[in-house]
Amino acid sequence: MGFLEEVRSYKESQIDTSPEYLRKLEELIEERKEFYDFEKALTSCGTKIIAEVKKASPSEGNIKEVNPEEQAKLYEKAGAIAISVLTDEKYFKGSLEDLRNVRESVKLPLLRKDFTVHKVQILEAKAYGADIVLLIVRMLSDKELKELLDFSEELGLSPLVEVFTLDEAKRALDAGAKIIGINNRDLETFKVDINKTKELAPKIKDLGAKFVISESGISKREEILELMNYQVDGFLIGTSLMKSENPYRKLKELLGF
């Protein structure tokens, strides 16, 4: 069994569709007052970075124990356009509580970073404060991708649709995706190569994507400047910020300040 198959099986086993839980989510959604526009943030001036709060990962193991709210506040102060919060507990040591706590701490669009395989997870994302949800094409059938993408938009959330190949990008765009994330990390081997973005970004823009985000493996300002030449609109950066002794200064450096 490959890594994504293992993850999918685990995620499906964790889905709670009980009437009581769905009512709880509906109540939390009704109570939510603040929403932030990710697409608008992607049209702002300057380098656009989605900064990630990530305590661990399958490729890195434990990275750093941090207070998610404090880390997110540093990112906001430094100039991130959005914050990505890992909510997966098993592989990334995250939680929905981390998402809720970050929501109460910053006034930026929030991405629920998780392996989304069911509509309940999208309800959770909205209930706990996300404005953006991650959909990984490689994990989903065409039917599932379309249903989850449409459901996200019906709830007023922005789907960030992640791809690793041009065929996956075509599937995403056929399903109606506007924001495509190119993962420079192969989720089966965990190998990282930012040339993946150089290879795919111009082609994906030519196919009609509104925005293209480069994800994973970016740690230097020079890499960002280089990738900007390939029609990249934004960058999702986690590990290099989490490993930094001064994440505020590191993010400023990546932004060009």
UniProtKB/Swiss-Prot annotation:
Its EC number is 4.1.1.48. InterPro entries: Aldolase_TIM (IPR013785), Indole-3-glycerol_P_synth (IPR045186), Indole-3-glycerol_P_synth_dom (IPR013798), Indole-3-GlycerolPSynthase_CS (IPR001468), RibuloseP-bd_barrel (IPR011060). Pfam families: IGPS. It is an enzyme of class 4 (lyase). It catalyses: 1-(2-carboxyphenylamino)-1-deoxy-D-ribulose 5-phosphate + H(+) = (1S,2R)-1-C-(indol-3-yl)glycerol 3-phosphate + CO2 + H2O. One of its GO terms (molecular function) is phosphoribosylanthranilate isomerase activity. Pathway: Amino-acid biosynthesis; L-tryptophan biosynthesis; L-tryptophan from chorismate: step 4/5. GO terms for biological process: L-tryptophan biosynthetic process. Keywords: Amino-acid biosynthesis, Aromatic amino acid biosynthesis, Decarboxylase, Lyase, Tryptophan biosynthesis. CDD domains: IGPS. NCBIfam families: PRK00278.2-4. Belongs to the TrpC family. PANTHER family: INDOLE-3-GLYCEROL-PHOSPHATE SYNTHASE (PTHR22854:SF2), TRYPTOPHAN BIOSYNTHESIS PROTEIN (PTHR22854). This is Indole-3-glycerol phosphate synthase. It comes from Aquifex aeolicus (strain VF5). The gene is trpC.
